[in-house]
Amino acid sequence: MALRCWDAARSLGSRIFGRYACSVRALSSLPDEKKKFLHNGPDLQDFVSGDLADKSTWDDYKGNLKRQKGERLRLPPWLKTKIPMGKNYNKLKNTLRNLNLHTVCEEARCPNIGECWGGGEYATATATIMLMGDTCTRGCRFCSVKTARNPPPLDPSEPDNTARAIAEWGLDYVVLTSVDRDDVVDGGAEHIAKTVSCLKERNPKILVECLTPDFRGDLRAVEKVALSGLDVYAHNVETVPELQRKVRDPRANFDQSLRVLKHAKEVQPDVVSKTSIMLGLGETDEQVYATMKALRAADVDCLTLGQYMQPTKRHLKVEEYVTPEKFKYWEEVGNELGFHYTASGPLVRSSYKAGEFFLKNLVAKRKTKVSKV
């Protein structure tokens, strides 16, 4: 299985070094030919920075893609990613630590952390800041974020610290998400709204996406965030209605999430709305299609679909690894249903490449439309 975070890379390095240190004495007793082979052989960099398997090898993959009873599926080649490296990755990581900020990229062990944090020639380096601490009051069975009934109190300096960090990075698109805080009166809506305000004060041109909780269905809290000055209102339904009780915390459900998305658009019609669905949890094609239709009927603008990845053995097992071709099919379905933007792929996540040109242009067009009215 490919390693998906820097901590895992460090762990691998220490294990390799430990084994090497234990075998130094044995090395001296090897024949010269074997010594030469080991000396000229690959090192750690050859494993972590080499090219990933190309598409031509995907067709030859013979492993099971659907889980049988008592089985744990092996990771197919199209889900293997590179270990995050580079100057921009390290810069973002260091800034976060210095300001005591958290990202969902790290806490949820996202496989795209190197790609999003690293940016690229045509991409915006994007880190999804996780507000209100790193401990959630809910226990969804797919999520690796820490949980507790009474997490530490909110940090009143977090909104300003977040704005300072984003200003230091020089980003033009930022994603704010949060843990669920059912222990806070408004679910943290005021805290999120204040963070958006601080960001806009420091940089009025910055585009802000908020991936929010459901606030226990409190539409006043939804309204508070929707009217905060954000550009994209995101809230994830996570899976099809039929699997909600199996996958999400009992306090969450599909209808409640749909009301959140609809209300955000009702109070702020020009905001871009967005949601995400994980595949590979046991859903059927008919259920996925019906869910997509329901989301579009609720006037959701953007949809992302990605492969569910089991973060630890304590979490839900992967029922199926969906092929890249099937994800492409769902992207085409999304376009046919009228979503303004559909991102569908094995490694796509709700905040994946949030600063892509299309989404940025969509926000810009809506702002231009409003200014002309």
Swiss-Prot record:
[4Fe-4S] cluster 1 binds at residues 105, 110, 116, 351. Its cofactor is [4Fe-4S] cluster. It is found in: Mitochondrion. GO terms for cellular component: mitochondrion. It is an enzyme of class 2 (transferase). GO terms for biological process: inflammatory response; lipoate biosynthetic process; neural tube closure; response to lipopolysaccharide; response to oxidative stress. Pfam families: LIAS_N (PF16881), Radical_SAM (PF04055). Binds 2 [4Fe-4S] clusters per subunit. One cluster is coordinated with 3 cysteines and an exchangeable S-adenosyl-L-methionine. CDD domains: Radical_SAM. Its main location: mitochondrion. Keywords: 4Fe-4S, Iron, Iron-sulfur, Metal-binding, Mitochondrion, S-adenosyl-L-methionine, Transferase, Transit peptide. The keyword S-adenosyl-L-methionine applies. The keyword rRNA-binding does not apply. InterPro entries: Aldolase_TIM, Elp3/MiaA/NifB-like_rSAM, LIAS_N, Lipoyl_synth, rSAM. It catalyses: [[Fe-S] cluster scaffold protein carrying a second [4Fe-4S](2+) cluster] + N(6)-octanoyl-L-lysyl-[protein] + 2 oxidized [2Fe-2S]-[ferredoxin] + 2 S-adenosyl-L-methionine + 4 H(+) = [[Fe-S] cluster scaffold protein] + N(6)-[(R)-dihydrolipoyl]-L-lysyl-[protein] + 4 Fe(3+) + 2 hydrogen sulfide + 2 5'-deoxyadenosine + 2 L-methionine + 2 reduced [2Fe-2S]-[ferredoxin]. Residues 121-340 form the Radical SAM core domain. GO terms for molecular function: 4 iron, 4 sulfur cluster binding; lipoate synthase activity; metal ion binding. [4Fe-4S] cluster 2 binds at residues 136, 140, 143. Residues 1-26 form a transit peptide. Pathway: Protein modification; protein lipoylation via endogenous pathway; protein N(6)-(lipoyl)lysine from octanoyl-[acyl-carrier-protein]: step 2/2. HAMAP family: Lipoyl_synth. Belongs to the radical SAM superfamily. Lipoyl synthase family. This is Lipoyl synthase, mitochondrial. It comes from Rattus norvegicus. The gene is Lias.
